[in-house]
Amino acid sequence: MKNNKTALAICLASLLALGTSAAQAVVFDDPKGDDKGPGNYIYPTDSVYKAGSFDITKVAITKNGDQAEFAVDVNSSLEDPWGMGVGFSVQMIFIFIKNAPDGHADGLPGLNVKFAPGHEWNKVVILSPQKKARVVGEAQTKAPKLVADISVPNTTRGNNRTIKGSVPLSELGGDGNVDAWAYQVIMQSNEGFPAAGDLLTRKVNEYEGQHRFGGGNDGDCDPHVMDVLESADAKQSEMLAYTCGPNGESVKPATLKMIKK
């Protein structure tokens, strides 16, 4: 009888552990219709940039064995007008993670954002329709001091309204408890011909163009960001507020905060 009770206890403990592992997921909902950056950004004029394409509606992070799966929903059906072959073309998503003390206060090249004290990021996962080799190569060239903390899925795919990719948990460090980490998600646009220092990101100018967002500044003092996660204590309009000098220099940069459940 004692052996039977011991076996039952072990079985129950195993089931509880499995349940805990399966429960390691976190979901963030984001308001619809806020894909305007700090409030006044405008989509490019080309028809490939459909309304809602850059509007984050939900972000889900799930621990699946030794992998972390990232899924981002947008407010428009995904299309592949540029023939990227992965179910989407125009979006590019940066998922910043805080799972350790300290971290990086500067965003990645081309985003023109910083992170507030105490909200510095430790790792970032990039969901791009570009091949992994292209994204990693650009990161090595344009963000050499940060590349060790950049992860890119082997394959990122889009289906219906969801863009999804997975990376090994070992690349993200921390304790592996994805539901306990803090996150910030930036929606940008896949740019195959980026500016010299930009990490495959599309610029925001004063006036929109065929392949340029409008409503910002022709300098690099404005955040090149269409949407981010927000919470009651971290409003998008406040985080993306910025001030430019007369020559397009940054006086007050957009400063992001991490969001945690």
Regions found by a protein language model. Name each.
Residues 25-40:
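Short N-terminal segments immediately surrounding and downstream of signal-peptide cleavage
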Residues 125, 131-200:
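Short helix-loop boundary/capping segments
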Residues 1-10:
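Bacterial N-terminal signal peptides that target proteins for export
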Residues 19-25:
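Sec/Tat signal peptide C-region and signal peptidase I cleavage site
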Residues 26-27, 43-129, 255-260:
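Surface-exposed, glycine/proline- and aromatic-rich loop segments on solvent-exposed faces
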Residues 9-19:
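Bacterial N-terminal signal peptides
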Residues 25-29, 99-116, 173-261:
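Acidic/polar low-complexity flexible segments
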